[in-house]
Amino acid sequence: MNYIPTQTFYGRRWRPRPAARPWPLQATPVAPVVPDFQAQQMQQLISAVNALTMRQNAIAPARPPKPKKKKTTKPKPKTQPKKINGKTQQQKKKDKQADKKKKKPGKRERMCMKIENDCIFEVKHEGKVTGYACLVGDKVMKPAHVKGVIDNADLAKLAFKKSSKYDLECAQIPVHMRSDASKYTHEKPEGHYNWHHGAVQYSGGRFTIPTGAGKPGDSGRPIFDNKGRVVAIVLGGANEGSRTALSVVTWNKDMVTRVTPEGSEEWSAPLITAMCVLANATFPCFQPPCVPCCYENNAEATLRMLEDNVDRPGYYDLLQAALTCRNGTRHRRSVSQHFNVYKATRPYIAYCADCGAGHSCHSPVAIEAVRSEATDGMLKIQFSAQIGIDKSDNHDYTKIRYADGHAIENAVRSSLKVATSGDCFVHGTMGHFILAKCPPGEFLQVSIQDTRNAVRACRIQYHHDPQPVGREKFTIRPHYGKEIPCTTYQQTTAETVEEIDMHMPPDTPDRTLLSQQSGNVKITVGGKKVKYNCTCGTGNVGTTNSDMTINTCLIEQCHVSVTDHKKWQFNSPFVPRADEPARKGKVHIPFPLDNITCRVPMAREPTVIHGKREVTLHLHPDHPTLFSYRTLGEDPQYHEEWVTAAVERTIPVPVDGMEYHWGNNDPVRLWSQLTTEGKPHGWPHQIVQYYYGLYPAATVSAVVGMSLLALISIFASCYMLVAARSKCLTPYALTPGAAVPWTLGILCCAPRAHAASVAETMAYLWDQNQALFWLEFAAPVACILIITYCLRNVLCCCKSLSFLVLLSLGATARAYEHSTVMPNVVGFPYKAHIERPGYSPLTLQMQVVETSLEPTLNLEYITCEYKTVVPSPYVKCCGASECSTKEKPDYQCKVYTGVYPFMWGGAYCFCDSENTQLSEAYVDRSDVCRHDHASAYKAHTASLKAKVRVMYGNVNQTVDVYVNGDHAVTIGGTQFIFGPLSSAWTPFDNKIVVYKDEVFNQDFPPYGSGQPGRFGDIQSRTVESNDLYANTALKLARPSPGMVHVPYTQTPSGFKYWLKEKGTALNTKAPFGCQIKTNPVRAMNCAVGNIPVSMNLPDSAFTRIVEAPTIIDLTCTVATCTHSSDFGGVLTLTYKTNKNGDCSVHSHSNVATLQEATAKVKTAGKVTLHFSTASASPSFVVSLCSARATCSASCEPPKDHIVPYAASHSNVVFPDMSGTALSWVQKISGGLGAFAIGAILVLVVVTCIGLRR
């Protein structure tokens, strides 16, 4: 659902009122067609009378058009007013008059009321207005926190889409109501606006009102501008003293924005006072009207009244009132008050499958449930005894009361034992619940020592394996560590939101009350209320409170049971219930799950050894510790493992960066630098070694290619020389006595006819004249050298030109006056040089400080761990039961015939085969769902918010811009337009799951299609909504003979299975170094894409050239240079100027990035600047004010292989060839080229001469 309304209107019934004039309107007389003198005099007279009337009106108010006669009353004698509470009656009267005057609506309020008459509707809950819905554009909007339905038949039927991000519900307006809708606008100049209670001030992006002008119940009211357009919808407010800041939903140009001041409260009206019923009469739940409603006076009637009101909102007020018997006096709240509810309950005896000796029994300490939702490993155990209250219903934390037959006995709390594979440490106890910290184990046992010193125990199968908190599996809490969020059971006995169901206990059979006496059966009640049913004779059925005798009867013919409905007991599946309808009560339980922080250890820092593009970590864990790492490029290459012993791990570190996470320590990010062996400005083998370390494949390819070219050139040259000599000498060799001309002889090295061979000649010269020998040898060498140096000089002249041509082929970033493109990389400085005729150049510097990619989310549902609710079974003795349909998730109900259950006192029923048991079960959200649940969202278009720092001249400002589209902002009086981003990339899929502070890209099933044992087996919109869906494969089974229980089978929780198999969160493996955050879900600082920027700088941002220093004789000298290092170069600008001042400095190429943006200059001096480059031989132009100089440097590779910061320069440099390397290439290629050219010339000349013959 798009929460930006569409401006669709068919006409408005309201138009803004024209501005009021400060003078009364007078009827203008009609001028005569032919003016005359008398008419002019009459006109002057009328004007004078009007002026006189206006002066009188300024002194006294005008009379109404139809004055009403006032009734004259006799003046009453003045009496001294009586003082009441320090105030007189006159003061009270004045206060009332002031209140009446204050309630009169002002101009702004009246104007809003006219508009609101059509476009807003009340939202009502149980007949009371809780807020408002507003018609804006083509949509009806209602705050999501306002409970109730819209008080309009057409609008109440609409299907609303809910957005938790904006706290808003939205639906399309019916077509016939669009004429009632208000316009809206995103234009919000600072000033005053209107709403129902008067003026609203808008300043600094916040709406504020005087404190007291708004109140709960105003949620959903619109704020209008002076044209009647909606600019915002009120959600709540935050009291800030004399003024209240409003929490609103408003509109920007292309998106919806929610403004929530700190401390804001929702302004939905509080619900009405909860009412309860008694005998078809209603009353406030906290004020029962009858004396018998006091539990101490009539226990059973009071419990029945509570059962009748168990589902009403004021149930707990009624429970408190009935138990404390409020009589107008105030009761002190104390710890014992928390135990007061337990006087209406009692412990019980239930079936236990293992009573500690391998056999089953009916145990007074039967274990009902074990909860382990706390992440700190704490267990919350529920059993059938009660702790902290004695058998007299008094609070005593040293006692445990348990059921011993029909009686209640006390045990000492110190005898309580809880154990798994070892003894547990008990942290807290109250009522039916125990908090304990236990070692891992496969069973759980609870035991006490009764009054006869016998051990009463119950053991159940339970797998306890607490998971670690954080990234280290430790056992002992450290003295020093790191605090991280976790959950635990809060050790408090105060009332909580968690509750358990109670019900009336069943009639308990007890054969010990029967005795045989001379053919008669005697029933000994012992002060109890007993039901009896004997088949001997007639009429032997009833209830008695005293001993009685059944004549002529046997014990086997009688069935007696004790009935006691003065106390509730827990709704246990191991004890039958007394009533067939699902009557129940509820009580709060202690020890709620709470969000806290847990101290966890921090693994010892690893020993880090930096290598070339890799890092070696020596890990020394004290306990199993999680180690993970990822790269920060497009492919994260995530890896994780649990380390249990000292190991060594080597991790590759690319230029894009790497992040490793060791235990609970903070993640560490590292970047590699372009380090290598050799020298870029040394001998050829050193240069080859240098480039082989940086680009091994390219270097090998280049060297092999150049070698092949050299060999081919040499072989080709030799072949041409041999061919030329052959062509030259062949004709003369075939002609006897022919003489070879001396020119051909020189070219072809042809021997004379009378001369010896070359070897003989050279040997002769060596023996006879060595000086001539060396001259003969030096001549051709000299020729070759002369040709080589000539070619070298030609190449040197073209060197700079060819280098610049190649450099222009690379990626460069140039800044123009009104548009540029900056990289979307946090911390990367981007600078542009702006020139304007008549002004000194201006350096514009921009840097992305922070980015936030926030998708638009639509909550599909939440899922969490379920709990299976198994009410006490209903056993119908001597009859049949029937299941009824109930609107419960995954509800199951079955009736089993032929049951014959036993309780601790004997058979529950008197019949043998006509008994039936009604078993039912359903699924509900676990109590832990409030703290531990996963939310399934559908993600739509994401908005990218960037915080950009802009600096130019004297302006240094940081702005927030949305770069999905065009976003215009004003910085220092200059309009900048940012966006749209070059890449629409997002790390989020269209379906994501959010669990605590982790985000997962996961394809989850839609609402209503969950599968048992999988993610989404239970689904609901919120953790408290009534739209719970469940599919857990719950199936009931037939109870075992002779036992009272409700067996069932069910697929384990899909949520808990998902927690084990959920995999790695997007937080740790997001590409491009994204940092995933929640509340709201967003990706921070993703280094992807470029941001176009357009600007329109005024002339005032520049310095006139006549006012700026004039730089002359600017020269650049590079002192030191280390490439591929963060500002590892230092250069010095030497200059002369006509006056002192400030000059902007800038590098006009992406080959180098300057650290400084401005420099102070004097009449003569030097300026030292720092630069960063990735080139070994950078050559770049630096400007100081309007003067420019070329800087050339010979850079050395960095010494540090790994650094903890990213490079501040562009790594894309082409060609990255040092000047020395180019010189050696030119020398080698020049020599080979000269040799090849000489061979070509010889071949050409010989060929030409041969053709002339």
Swiss-Prot record:
Chain location of the short sequence motif Nuclear export signal per the record: 150-160
Glycosylation sites: N280, N327, N533, N595, N956, N1085
Region (Binding to the viral RNA): 87-120
Record note on what altering I1112T does: In strain: A7 and MTV
Peptidase S3 domain boundaries: 119-267
Residue ranges, annotated region (Interaction with the capsid protein): 723-727
Region span, Transient transmembrane before p62-6K protein processing: 728-748
Region (Dimerization of the capsid protein): 189-199, 225-229
Post-translational modification: Envelope E1, E2 and E3 proteins are N-glycosylated.
Residues covered by region (Ribosome-binding): 105-119
Renumbered residue ranges of the record's region Disordered: 58-109
Annotated phenotype, changing R63G: In strain: L10
Catalytic residues (positions): H145, D167, S219
Other notes: Belongs to the Old World alphaviruses that usually cause fever, maculopapular rash, arthralgia and myalgia. The mature virion nucleocapsid consists of 240 copies of the capsid protein. 80 spike trimers of E1 and E2 are present at the surface of mature virion. They project about 100 Angstroms from the outer surface and are located at the local and strict three fold axis of the icosahedral lattice. The glycoproteins splay out to form a protein shell or skirt covering most of the outer surface of the membrane bilayer.
Entry protein name: Structural polyprotein
Organism, as annotated: Semliki forest virus
